[in-house]
Swiss-Prot record:
GO terms for biological process: translation. Part of the 30S ribosomal subunit. Interacts with proteins S7 and S18. Binds to IF-3. The lineage of its organism: Bacteria, Bacillati, Mycoplasmatota, Mycoplasmoidales, Metamycoplasmataceae. Belongs to the universal ribosomal protein uS11 family. Keywords: Ribonucleoprotein, Ribosomal protein, RNA-binding, rRNA-binding. This is Small ribosomal subunit protein uS11.
Length: 129
């Protein structure tokens, strides 16, 4: 059984929103990167294709924001990553829970002609043209 986390008094932190095609994960950290609270669409109770919806992302953000509020977080810097549909709804839900958003940053990694993609990805890219 995991031990209960101590209540921390942290006024500001970073909210990381990772939104993929299948799931949305929200993590609240302090400025150093230590995790304070986290939640995901799957943790909240959504299964299968329902995890990728924006409603599931907002419910996960509500759960994570509630835990972060208990640790004293009042303002965050939001870093969003990924191409999923739940990024904006998760950010809005964080604001609804009374946590002030000071900065919004998109940190989605974009390759600048890196390694060659697998054959199936190349086929998909050719079909789109």
């Amino acid at each position: 059984m995991a031990r209960k986390a101590k209540k921390k008094n942290i006024s500001s932190g970073v909210a990381h929103i990772h939104s993929s095609n299948q799931n949305t994960i929200i993590t609240f950290t302090d400025e150093k990167g230590n995790v304070i609270a986290w939640s995901s669409s799957g943790k909240v109770g959504f299964k299968g294709t329902k995890k990728k919806t924006s409603f599931a992302a907002s419910e996960a953000a509500k759960d994570a924001a509630q835990m972060a509020k208990e640790h004293g977080i009042s303002q965050v810097r939001v870093e969003m990553k990924g191409l999923g549909s739940g990024k904006d709804s998760a950010r809005k839900q964080i604001e609804v829970w009374g946590i002030k958003v000071t900065e919004i940053k998109d940190v989605t990694p974009i390759p600048h002609n890196g390694t060659r993609p697998p054959k199936r990805v190349l086929k998909r890219l050719r079909l789109k043209k």
